[in-house]
């Protein structure tokens, strides 16, 4: 091989090496772009999951119990109320977990689901429609599978309203809203009491608002409408433009008290530190 041929061979090898290097760089850059795109997609997916499951700022647990085997007739209004209230709250930005005709296990699971999602930015609402009984100066929501013959059965078979409120507080909820429509004559108390005692006063933890369908110790009738007296009036007030929770609850109390001429006086207890608006645009 002469000198000229050797020089050409060297230039050819150098050119090939440069070409291989360029191709390698292109492949590497393409792979890096793909990895960045994959990482971005993962981040978006994580944000979506976190936003819908872990970081929702408004949560509601709505329980409507209507079909109690021990009752003479179903509480159809409780089911209607739970459905209508769930629909209204969803329109107002709440992520609603609705449970109908819940057993004790169903109610405990629902409370635990709620517990797992509460954080310090969360406004939490609990609604219960059904039968409620007080025992030991504490109010209990009764599941449809409750078997009650004595007062101790209430504590064992029921779900404590104060217990759910305590859970909300321990989880650090920003605000706690509770609506209890359970001051009805029930088929259980006559087995161990001479008359129905209604519900006990519900303790109000910090930054909480509680609406109950009757005064402590009182029972009320449901009326004959599609919804209970309490929920029918509450739905009207929730839909008012710019309604705050405290305003809606108080207007509900006043309207029912006046319409019934004092026969039914709902109770509102508040320790709220700021206004909570049902319409998100209102605050």
Model-identified regions with their sequence ranges:
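Cysteine endopeptidase catalytic domains of the caspase/legumain-like
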Residues: 2-283
């Amino acid at each position: 091989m002469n000198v000229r041929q050797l020089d050409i061979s060297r230039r050819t090898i150098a050119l090939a090496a440069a070409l291989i290097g360029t191709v390698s760089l292109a492949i590497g850059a393409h792979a890096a772009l793909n990895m960045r795109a994959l990482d971005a997609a993962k981040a978006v997916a994580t944000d979506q999951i976190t936003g819908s499951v872990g970081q929702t700022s408004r949560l509601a647990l709505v329980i409507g119990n209507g079909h109690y085997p021990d009752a003479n007739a179903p509480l159809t209004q409780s089911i209607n109320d739970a459905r209508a209230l769930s629909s209204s709250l969803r329109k107002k930005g709440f992520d609603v977990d609705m449970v109908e005709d819940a057993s004790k296990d169903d109610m405990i699971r629902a409370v635990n689901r709620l517990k797992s999602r509460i954080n310090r930015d969360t406004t939490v609402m609990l609604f219960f429609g059904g039968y409620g009984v007080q025992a030991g100066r504490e109010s209990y929501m009764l599941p449809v599978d409750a078997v009650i013959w004595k007062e101790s059965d209430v504590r064992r078979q029921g779900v404590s309203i104060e217990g759910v409120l305590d859970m909300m507080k321990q989880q650090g909820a920003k605000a706690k809203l509770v609506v209890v429509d359970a001051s009805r004559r029930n088929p259980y108390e006559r087995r161990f009491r001479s008359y129905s005692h209604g519900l006990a006063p519900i303790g109000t933890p910090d930054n909480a608002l509680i609406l109950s369908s009757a005064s402590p110790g009182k029972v009320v009738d449901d009326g004959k409408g599609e919804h209970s007296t309490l929920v029918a009036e509450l739905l009207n007030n929730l839909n008012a433009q710019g309604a705050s929770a405290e305003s809606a609850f108080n207007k509900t109390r006043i309207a029912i008290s006046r319409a019934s001429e004092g026969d039914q006086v709902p109770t509102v207890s508040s320790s709220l530190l700021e206004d909570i608006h049902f319409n998100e645009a209102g605050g």
